[in-house]
């Protein structure tokens, strides 16, 4: 994140003696940072030596297996009934991706009984359904429906669900996930025209310190593999930390939509950026207010980007063939837009109650076999219907 945060006990000066009470020895300092020593970092103070690992075991590979895309066409996927079960990490199913980003879903029914560390990617978990607690060495974050959980490289975390199940749309990338640069000044502060403010970002506000000894499983993802590390101490043994690298939460319900005289393009709704992709939030808002405005989007061609939309809630549900939890993929180079009759039907509308997450990628996406199993046939043909009373979704 672009702002500094500290939590817990810290020595007055970094890299100096920080002693435990009652002659208990030194706390162990760890510098955790990105891009060598040139990126954002945090300093953490542990009860135990961070490198202590009893045993290591390779569990398997994690690289997605992509299938032949077939003829280029618009596609839709019905995900409401994806299999549920397992913990959030185990339940994840990757549907599409490229070298810059993977997109998937998770529908867990239980909390994690191990710890997870993705050392090769940032992760962003959009909470569509459910609530719970994300615990990490940086502290505790409570999450609920609508929250984006942004988890940076190297975070050792565990997710505890509050209810019997949850549903997430998951973005994973080997680059940073951060607010768009155009929203920030040269010092990293969010500017007045940004659609959210630092006050909207929730950071860990309390530590959950453990000094337990025993056997604790940490599953480490790196080099497209998962390894099981058994520690002889609880990994959340941090008594204090400070810096710029830590997990955080932003709620889609805190996004401040921009409206205009005429239809606003999708970049207006951008929420985060990564390398070669953007993430946008479509939220309830007023429509355009020119007397001759057409609220439905104009037809457009993604000449250099693939567009993926995850439909969470709202008025898109009346659109032909699109339901809650569906995903659409509009690939490179093909025009898309309102279905027949939708443009005319939008005239006179004053607001929308839609809620959706969009990811635009600047390199083509590949599909997995899981995606093909969920595909809804005939989506490409929905533009062939006769004009009439149609429906529309204002994201495109």
Predicted regions and their residues:
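Jelly-roll (double-stranded beta-helix
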Residues: 1-396
């Amino acid at each position: 994140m672009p702002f500094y945060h500290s939590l817990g006990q810290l020595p007055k000066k970094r890299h100096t003696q920080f002693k435990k009470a009652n002659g208990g020895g030194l706390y162990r300092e760890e510098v955790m940072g990105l891009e060598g020593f040139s990126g954002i970092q945090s300093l953490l103070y542990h009860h135990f030596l961070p490198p202590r690992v009893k045993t290591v075991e390779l569990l398997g590979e994690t690289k997605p297996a992509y299938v032949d895309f077939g003829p280029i066409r618009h596609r839709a996927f019905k995900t409401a009934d994806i299999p549920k079960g397992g913990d959030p990490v185990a339940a994840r199913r990757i549907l599409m991706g490229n070298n810059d980003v993977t997109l998937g879903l998770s529908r867990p029914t239980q909390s994690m009984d191990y710890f997870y560390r993705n050392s090769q990617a940032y992760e962003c978990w959009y909470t569509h359904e459910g609530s719970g607690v994300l615990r990490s060495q940086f502290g505790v974050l409570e999450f609920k429906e609508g929250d984006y959980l942004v988890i940076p490289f190297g975070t050792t975390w565990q997710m505890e669900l509050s209810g019997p199940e949850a549903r997430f749309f998951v973005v994973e990338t080997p680059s940073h996930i951060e607010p768009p640069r155009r929203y920030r000044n040269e010092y990293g502060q969010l500017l007045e025209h940004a659609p959210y403010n630092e006050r909207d970002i929730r950071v860990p506000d309390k530590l959950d310190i453990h000094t337990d000894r025993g056997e604790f499983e940490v599953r480490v993802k790196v080099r497209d593999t998962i390894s099981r590390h058994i520690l002889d101490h609880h990994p959340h043994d941090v008594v204090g930390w400070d810096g710029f690298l830590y997990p955080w939460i932003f709620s889609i319900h805190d996004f401040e939509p921009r409206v205009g005289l005429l239809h606003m393009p999708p970049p207006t709704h951008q929420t985060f950026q990564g390398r070669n992709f953007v993430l946008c939030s479509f939220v309830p808002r007023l429509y355009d207010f020119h007397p001759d405005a057409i609220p439905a989007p104009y037809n457009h061609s993604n000449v250099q980007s693939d567009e993926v939309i995850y439909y969470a809630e709202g008025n898109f549900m009346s659109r032909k063939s699109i339901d809650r939890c569906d995903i659409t993929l509009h690939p490179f180079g093909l025009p898309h837009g309102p279905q027949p009759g939708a443009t005319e039907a939008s005239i006179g509308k004053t607001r929308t109650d839609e809620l959706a997450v969009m990811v635009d990628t600047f390199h083509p996406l590949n599909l997995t076999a899981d995606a093909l199993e969920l595909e809804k046939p005939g989506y490409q043909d929905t533009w062939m219907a006769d004009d009439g009373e149609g429906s529309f979704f204002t994201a495109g």
